UniProtKB/Swiss-Prot annotation:
Major enzyme class: hydrolase
Stated name of the protein: Cytosolic carboxypeptidase 1
EC number: 3.4.17.-, 3.4.17.24
Organism expressing this protein natively: Gallus gallus
Protein origin, superkingdom: Eukaryota
Positions of Zn(2+) binding: H918, E921, H1015
Length: 1224
């Protein structure tokens, strides 16, 4: 009975409302004299229902209801004051709840125009009806934010001054001026209105309303501050406020509220004052007035006092934003932003950044612009476009010309000219008649795969030298060599290396074997001597004698050192024979194979007779210390390096522990920014001493024991200048790429002289990208020499309090592509060292030098089975710096020299791989190392892969850039991966000849089945691929194209799909097959479009880690990168089997691959260039990369905190119209 009663009541209420609205509509139509009373009565009844029944509100604003039209029509036509008041009250009730939807309905029905006209009519009355004005402004304030054109409408109707005059005339009538101020705030969002109101004295008026702390009228104070903040965004109004001294007044008001609001009840008012200061400091005059009023110190002190209260974070963040904005722009402390190293180009480009740099007058200051801080441009509107194009314009980058998208195979060079590349394909003409080939597959060459320990190779004099003999054919090693056969028999399989535990278990066996293989090595003590001079590896009789008999100790003024006898063999150190010192002089760092004792420990060691032996663990089977030194001697660098970095000498093995993605501590960014601001406030605390400087040859290492020593004068090193800021804090400046004035990202340097238990802060202050994975859990890498000597030679992720943010160092327009007002960014991290006086190396990512590549290739060549593997290393060309660019050919030897086997050998499809076109993307080399080692392994699947394909591999397309520590360019100062369309043989020889190889294959009708260029990605996680597709590119545009133009073989998706199922680090959801205009000159697009390779890819490996799969939540290491290289090979084998239906049954999951549509096409329009929105979750602490955020909500963390999950895009939608996959 109760339910029935409620239902009856509801129906009656609904019918009652409809009846009243019908009566009101009839009154509007009749317009009979005397109907005013009826309208007054009906509207009063409706108002009562609306105030008492929520259901009535929903019914009147529901879709299909004409209630709003009827009420607005009545409001527009009636002249009865009470009816108008009733209707206004009804509308206020309707829009007071229900979010913004109801207000939007009112706007779409024309409510704004009616209200403004009513306001104009009411203003003509004298005096105006106060109640009417209150209701009108209250309603306008509620619907105004939903009407984007309300500012223009108000100005045209003349409503601006009506509201302003009401405030001026009723300053004591808080009930009236409160809604008027709310409307003025809405009006002020229009810049023209803000200027107009400013001319009429609105700024001065606001400062009459706001004032020091008071518990009275706090609502009015808050609204007045919000209105003032909006008005001051106008440069004209901001100047007016500065001229009248209001900046000092705002600071005084803020301090007063800060002191008295001890219970933090008025945080919004305090934030409102800060928003006004934030607006006025958008102009230079405002920033100057802020500094003159001691604003930096005031906000710094108040924000420090707010740190303890989490709810006051919006005040701290807004204060930080203002201080960063007002921090004086500093000049980067460099004489020029051009590289410290100079290389004269053989040909100067006709246009482009390099040409502009060469054409600059010698007296031009390229570090900072004279007008850097002179413009009054509103810095709030600055668009971040470093490195990538702004996302607002990314649609323009997608290629929409269907004719350009269609692959067009064209040689580009005469066939006669391309014949020069025939020499790089001897496998197509080799008859193998002189080889002892058996007709059956030989047994695996590795007979003792469980034996750990080092790999012994021929001496350096017997091994391959790229400079003297660039071409090596795999069959040159003869089976009759008994020493070589013995070496093969004891070599472990590449992919079957024993784990550390099994190595320990067989330590006795290892010792017995190694004592027969290795001479005594030089031992090292636990303590490292501070200031020990670097050891010169020169061919002197003294050195030869020491290294032949035992340990050598180098004396200096501070330390008394004596030779130490080795108590046992260092099992894992390669012999330092006399060949190490032949040829040019090469220096190691502060450690070599020497015994070193400090003065304090010397007496103890002598008296006790105890000697501590430090061992270097067994590293990669293709690493050899001696051979590395030999390779260094043939490497040519522009600075003519004579030192060798210890990580490259000792080698690296992955640490045995997992390295999770670092969880960012809350508030770390603002803490670092506060410390930066302290430099201005407490200038006397700043040391500001240069401790390392490539530009100043006379700048020697500091003598003080408490000062760190730095060095980067070794292969791939990059560190230009170091300035000590505080006792344990250093600013580091990176070197530009040679013949360039930017690309600051890669770093690799040495640090020594540290103490334990101290947190050292390092700030790399001239980074250029607007964001970094350092904000999302990535850590820099450190290599400890002491740890390496303690059998732990590993690069490990280190650092706490890591963040990446915009700093106060100006970036000149010359270095920013013509854009003025740009700033650099800072990577900051803190490290506490484990060992006193250690020598440590820091790097952006795992270093992999050109000399390391040469060593690895030579080791692979010397260790392979020539009867099983066809291996050839050639010199593709010579680089600008005089270094050889190696190209490697790998396949399986033919089963025999019979015609059928030779024919099968020659007709294997080609796979063309390349890597390291960008020197800073070292992870690409580690992936390539995994690929090479897998291809050269005795794994049965590797043998099957070799029998399936011929691999042409250019493992390092940019040797010069790698050697000289560049991040992106070669010695030409240009990004080589943007030169594939028209490479210059003089400036881009590696690209010119790599493209020539592919053009030659196209000319002889031997197109590679797959081309893949290995890269690294600094802005995204996981490993993924970029490919090329006409259909997917067009799907991302609004261009209508005939379906016949979009017909293409979807086989380009097969390999990425295979990798997503086989490689743990690979993520299909991050792959993209869109072709952009900005990428038309890259290898991927040119090889697809011009050469005609459908499966043309760029494989991107994260620098950070993974957020999916087996490695979710972990930072990526060399083990995972090498695994990816091996898994890529496995994917190629599966691809081959899929292309041969008789040989392999297709998995059902891959059969329908051609039916997949583009995922997330509505959101991602250019994913190869831009970071996806869902790539990273939001922080609990809002990350402010820029010092000039334009978001009014930037500090309101309480409203923004929430769990945010990245939307994993699924790759499984179907397209019924797509063609079936062509497996060929």
């Amino acid at each position: 009975m109760k339910v029935k009663k409620n239902l009856t009541c509801s129906v009656s209420t609904s019918s009652r409302t409809m009846s009243l609205l019908s009566q009101l509509e009839k009154i509007n139509l009749d317009s009979v004299l005397g109907e005013a009373d009826n309208a007054r009565y009906v509207t009063a009844k409706i108002l009562h229902l609306v105030q008492s029944q929520e259901k009535t509100k929903k019914e009147m604003t529901s879709k299909g209801s004409s209630a709003i039209e009827v009420i607005l029509s009545t409001l527009e036509n009636t002249r009865d004051p009470q009816t108008i008041l009733n209707i206004l009250s009804i509308l206020i009730e309707l829009v007071s709840v229900g979010g913004g939807r109801r207000a939007s309905v009112l706007v779409t029905k024309g409510g704004t125009q009616i209200l403004l006209q009513l306001l104009l009519n009411a203003s003509k009355e004298s005096p105006p009806n106060e109640e009417l004005m209150v209701l009108l402004h209250t309603l306008l304030a509620k619907i105004g934010p939903k009407d984007k054109k309300i500012g223009m409408k108000a100005r045209i109707n003349g409503a601006l001054n009506i509201s302003l005059n009401l405030v001026k005339q009723n300053l004591q009538n808080h009930r009236l001026i409160l809604p008027c101020l709310q409307v003025l705030r809405v009006y002020s969002t229009n810049s023209v209105n803000a200027v107009s109101l400013g001319k009429n004295g609105v700024v001065e008026l606001m400062f009459k309303i706001i004032g020091p702390f008071s518990k009275k009228n706090t609502s009015l104070m808050k609204v007045a501050l919000d209105t003032l903040a909006a008005l001051l965004k106008s440069k004209t109004n901001a100047r007016r406020a500065v001229d009248r001294g209001y900046v000092h007044m705002l600071l005084t008001i803020y301090v007063d509220w800060h002191r008295h609001d001890s219970r933090h009840r008025y945080m919004l008012i305090r934030k409102g004052v800060l928003q006004c200061i934030k607006s006025v400091t958008n102009i230079k005059l405002g920033r100057k007035a802020f500094i003159d009023a001691n604003g930096m110190k005031i906000l710094y002190n108040t924000s420090q006092e707010c740190l303890a209260v989490r709810t006051l974070d919006p005040l701290v963040n807004t204060s930080s934003l203002i201080m960063r904005k007002c921090f004086p722009k500093n000049r980067l402390p460099l004489p020029t932003i051009k590289s410290a190293f100079h290389f004269q180009l053989p040909v100067i480009p006709a246009s482009g950044p390099v040409a502009q740099m060469y054409n600059l007058p010698p007296d031009v200051d390229d570090v900072v612009d004279e007008s850097d801080d002179n413009d009054d441009a509103e810095t709030e509107s600055e668009i971040e476009t470093e490195d990538d194009k702004d996302q607002n314009f990314k649609n323009d980058d997608i290629e929409t010309d269907i004719n350009k998208l269609k692959p067009r195979q064209e040689l580009g060079r005469p066939l006669e000219e391309l014949k020069m590349y025939e020499q790089f394909f001897p496998e197509l003409t080799e008859n193998f008649q002189e080889c002892d080939l058996v007709s059956k597959e030989p047994k695996p060459f590795v007979s003792n795969a469980n034996l750990g320990g080092p790999i012994v190779v021929p001496t350096a004099g017997e091994e391959f030298s790229a400079e003297t003999n660039p071409s090596v054919i795999g069959i040159s090693l003869k089976e009759g060599n008994p020493l070589l056969t013995e070496e093969y028999n004891r070599r472990p399989a590449f992919l079957g290396l024993p784990k550390k535990d099994s190595i320990k278990a067989s330590s006795l066996l290892q010792q017995n074997v190694q004592r027969n293989l290795l001479p005594s090595c030089q031992c090292l003590s636990q303590e490292i001597v501070t200031g020990l001079d670097r050891i010169s590896l020169q061919n002197t009789s003294e050195n030869d004698q020491y290294y032949a008999t035992g340990c050598v100790i180098k004396k200096d003024n501070k330390t008394s050192l004596t030779p130490l006898a080795c108590s046992k063999t260092c099992e894992h150190v390669s012999p330092c024979g006399s060949s190490l010192f032949e040829g040019s002089s090469v220096h190691l760092g502060k450690f070599c194979c020497t015994g070193v004792e400090s003065e304090e420990e010397d007496s103890k060691s002598s008296s006790s007779g105890e000697q501590v032996v430090l061992e270097v663990s067994d590293v990669s089977p293709v690493h050899d210390c001696d051979l590395y030194i030999e390779m260094v001697k043939t490497t040519k660098s522009i600075p003519e390096y004579s030192e060798v970095a210890y990580p490259d000498y000792f080698g690296h093995i992955p640490p045995p522990f997992k390295e999770p993605i670092l969880e960012r501590p809350y508030g770390v960014q603002r803490t670092k920014i506060s410390q930066d601001i302290e430099r201005l406030i407490h200038q006397n605390d700043i040391i500001d001493r240069v401790v390392y400087d490539l530009d100043n040859s006379i700048c020697s290492a500091p003598e003080e024991v408490d000062v760190l020593k730095f060095n980067s004068k070794f292969e791939s090193g990059n560190l230009r200048k170091v300035i000590q800021i505080r006792k344990n804090e250093y600013d580091l400046i990176l070197n530009s790429d040679i013949n360039s004035n930017h690309y600051h990202q890669w770093f690799y340097f040495e640090v020594s002289g540290m103490k334990t238990g101290i947190g050292y802060r390092f700030n790399i202050i001239n980074c250029e990208k607007s964001n970094s994975q350092f904000n999302y859990g990535m850590q820099p890498l450190m290599y400890s020499v002491q740890e390496a000597l303690n059998s732990r030679p590993s690069w490990t992720r280190v650092g706490t309090d890591i963040c990446y943010y915009k700093n106060h160092f100006s970036r000149s327009s010359i270095a920013a592509g013509g854009q003025k007002g740009k700033s650099y960014y800072t990577i900051t991290f803190t490290v506490t060292f484990q060992h006193k006086d250690d020598v440590c190396y820091f790097a952006y990512h795992y270093p992999y030098t050109y000399s390391t590549l040469k060593m690895h290739l030579q080791k692979l060549e010397s260790m392979h089975n020539p009867q099983q593997i066809y291996f050839r290393q050639d010199a593709l060309c010579e680089t600008l710096g005089g270094n050889i660019c190696p190209i490697v050919t790998i396949t399986a030897m033919p089963e025999s020299n019979y015609y059928e086997h030779i024919c099968q050998f020659r007709n294997r499809p080609y796979i063309f791989l390349s890597a390291r076109v960008h020197p800073g993307e070292t992870n690409a080399s580690w992936v390539m190392k995994g690929t090479l080692e897998y291809l050269m392994s005795s794994n049965p699947s590797a043998q099957s892969l070799r029998e399936s394909y011929i691999f042409k591999i250019i493992p390092m397309l940019n040797p010069d850039g790698v050697i000289n520590g560049n991040h992106r360019c070669s010695l030409s100062g240009e990004d080589l991966n943007r030169q594939w369309q028209n490479p210059n043989p003089d400036l881009h020889p590696t690209i010119y000849h790599a493209k020539g190889l592919l053009q030659y294959l196209a000319a002889i009708k031997r197109l590679p089945l797959v081309y893949c260029d290995y890269h690294g990605h600094s802005r995204k996680k996981n490993v993924f691929m970029y490919g090329c597709s006409i259909k997917e590119t067009m799907w991302h545009t609004n261009v209508n194209t005939a379906s016949c133009d979009l017909m293409e073989d979807p086989g380009y998706r097969v390999l990425p799909k295979i990798l997503s199922q086989t490689a743990p680090a690979f993520c299909m959801g991050s792959c993209s097959f869109v072709v952009e205009k900005s990428k038309e000159s890259t290898a991927r697009v040119v090889v697809w479009r011009e050469i005609g390779v459908q499966r043309s890819y760029t494989m991107e490996s994260t620098l950070c880690g993974c957020d999916q799969g087996k490695y979710k939540g972990l930072q990526i290491g060399t083990k995972e990168l090498e695994e990816m290289g091996a898994k890529f090979c496995v994917g190629l084998l599966r691809l081959k089997r899929m292309a041969s239906p008789l040989e392999y049954n297709l998995p059902s999951g891959l059969l329908d691959i051609e039916n997949e549509l583009i995922e997330s096409s509505c959101k991602v329009t250019s994913p190869t260039t831009y970071v996806l929105d869902e790539d990273e979750p939001r922080f609990l602490e809002e990350v402010d990369y820029s010092a000039e955020s334009n978001d009014d909500q930037d500090a309101e963390l309480a409203d923004n905190v929430g769990d945010y999950e990245a939307n994993n895009q699924e790759d499984g939608l179907s397209d019924s119209d797509s063609t079936r996959i062509l497996l060929s």
